[in-house]
């Protein structure tokens, strides 16, 4: 089979959990945008250009209330600052992807990062091709689902209670899968423990960045200690 076709096939199979998650959350976003007075085209454009998931839901409130550009920018920075940590993991891969590098940085999300981490055993070139197609497919899922939700929201009333839990379910599934595939569980236990403490200290709206900083510091220190031994 053609290497690019094989990479696309592999990326599609790996992206199925993301598809299931993005389908419901993207539609929810489109419906909420429609309820706020924005048509399906606005949902499609925002998802294609902004593509930040959780922040897009916050953006609905900002757009409806006429928030300042500064407020929107600062909120976006804090809500998406964790992506800079994700990108560090794949810097060597992105550097080898030429003109696609900037798109890969733009399209790196929580979900694509988690799935990319499962591709580490592939040969470098195959891994990079698979990562690229995974990014494109995931971007398409989110954008298409947002537009579809905007269209359906115009004609069908929806009860959105509990729809956001599908994202939690996705991450629990990925966590369990990674736990079963690896023999060293210290990173997972460190991240889980720090996240629980940070949640208790900083609250649901402010725990993500501190948890990432502390977990990263622990893993860097542990890696240096292991290397010295």
Q: Which residues fall in each region the model found?
A:
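Helix-loop-helix junctions within the multi-pass membrane cores of secondary transporters/permeases
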Residues: 3, 73-164
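Juxtamembrane membrane-interface segments at transmembrane alpha-helix termini
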Residues: 56-62, 85-90, 176-181, 199-208, ...
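Short, Lys/Arg-rich, polar N-terminal cytosolic tail immediately upstream
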Residues: 1-10
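Membrane-embedded alpha-helical modules
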Residues: 128-210, 221
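Pore-lining transmembrane helices
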Residues: 10-105, 118-119, 141, 187, ...
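Alpha-helical transmembrane segments and their membrane-interface exit regions
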Residues: 51-54, 78-85, 170-176, 195-197, ...
């Amino acid at each position: 089979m053609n290497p690019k076709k094989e990479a696309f096939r592999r990326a599609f199979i790996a992206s199925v959990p993301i598809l299931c998650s993005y389908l419901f959350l993207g539609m929810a976003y489109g419906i909420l945008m429609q309820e706020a007075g924005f048509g399906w085209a606005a949902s499609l454009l925002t998802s294609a250009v902004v593509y930040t998931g959780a922040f897009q839901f916050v953006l609905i409130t900002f757009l409806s209330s006429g928030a300042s550009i500064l407020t929107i920018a600062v909120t976006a920075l804090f809500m998406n600052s964790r992506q800079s940590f994700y990108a560090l993991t794949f810097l060597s891969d992105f550097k080898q992807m030429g003109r696609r590098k900037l798109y890969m940085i733009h399209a790196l999300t929580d979900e694509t990062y988690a799935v990319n981490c499962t591709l580490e055993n592939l040969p470098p070139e195959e891994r990079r091709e698979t990562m690229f197609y995974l990014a494109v497919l995931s971007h398409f899922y989110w954008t298409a689902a947002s537009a579809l939700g905007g269209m359906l929201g115009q004609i069908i009333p929806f009860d959105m209670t509990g729809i956001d839990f599908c994202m939690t379910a996705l991450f629990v599934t990925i966590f369990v899968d990674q736990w079963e595939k690896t023999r060293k569980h210290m990173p997972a236990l460190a991240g889980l423990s720090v996240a629980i403490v940070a949640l208790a200290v900083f609250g649901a709206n402010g725990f993500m960045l501190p948890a990432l900083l502390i977990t990263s510091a622990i893993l860097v220190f542990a890696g240096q200690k292991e290397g010295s031994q």
